Amino acid sequence: MKRAEKREHLIDVATRLFNRLGYHAAGIDQVIAEAGLAKTTLYRHFKSKEDLIVAVLRRLDEKYRDAMRQTVDKLAQEPHAKLLATFDFLENWFKNDAFYGCPFMSAAGEYGERPNPILQEAVVHKRLMIAYFEELARAANLQEPHRIAEEINLLHEGATAVAHVTGDADTAR
């Protein structure tokens, strides 16, 4: 495996473990054991567990936002319909076997006591989501697009939390 492939493999394995077990509960030893790599390899790519978590969150942010955009663009053409299609995306995500709630809220919950790079990544993701919802609200010519974007974000957050706790994907409807 090439150097870049090892880094990506570590991020993939860490993503699965952190989502399933939690950021604190999943240890570095578990990550390297499941990845089948040496601890020195991990530390060649990441200075600390926190750096690995930041890399995981960045990857998740990129994948999540790309997947939502693709789904929304595929399902809807009209601006108003695109706003509603964001909830169809959520429903599909909730039905995925790898759905364990919002990884950004989990990270913020586990590392949010003080300002740090992990909390910062969670905040960046939430702000980027609000910006996307605002973009959709502006395209739909809605009044107060930022306020509407924040409200849509709250609906998404609530639906995600309820789906995680209850296992009911219909909370996105």
Protein language model annotation of sequence segments:
Residues 6-15, 31, 56-60, 64, ...:
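Generic hydrophobic, amphipathic alpha-helix propensity
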Residues 9, 16-51, 55:
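Helix-turn-helix
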Residues 1-5:
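N-terminal intrinsically disordered/low-complexity leader segments
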Residues 55, 69-96, 139, 149-152:
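Hydrophobic alpha-helical connector segments
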Residues 118-124, 139-173:
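Hydrophobic/aromatic-rich alpha-helical bundle segments in the mid-to-C-terminal region
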Residues 96-116, 120:
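Amphipathic alpha-helical segments used for helix-helix packing
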Residues 62-65, 81, 114-139, 150:
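Amphipathic alpha-helical packing segments from all-alpha helical-bundle domains
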